[in-house]
Amino acid sequence: MSRVVITGLGAVTPLGNDTETFLNGIFNEKMGIKPITKFDASETGITVAGQVDGFDPAQRVGKRDARKMDLFSQYAVDAADQALENAGLKSAEGSENPTTVQDPTRFGVILGNGIGGLTTIQDQVIKMHDKGPQRVSPLFVPESI
């Protein structure tokens, strides 16, 4: 049997956009469910959700790369970056220390997703409906996964 050790954590959640804030929220029994503010939900019959607030993709993902990713992918990249820093495999943003070099056969990352990219899918379907299929982005599929 192989040993498995979790050495780094990262989080982008309704309770906070870093592991410390997230864990403090959990341990202090804070609620991440709040009134929906990201879109008009008045016709859905749903008024609350677990939304991520205060997320700035430019901090870790970068503006250019963020334009090519759905929001859920930006969350994943940010959380993965945090986990690498937490594990000591990457220097913190702005640090003068170089990234630590590791043997790639000695570590890995597990990331799961049920469904994502719905914002990108919705935007492209609306674009196709309103402007025709020629206006759908050729990067539609990669942007949504």
Named regions from a protein language model:
Residues 1-145:
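Conserved "HGTGT" condensation-loop signature of ketosynthase/thiolase-family condensing enzymes
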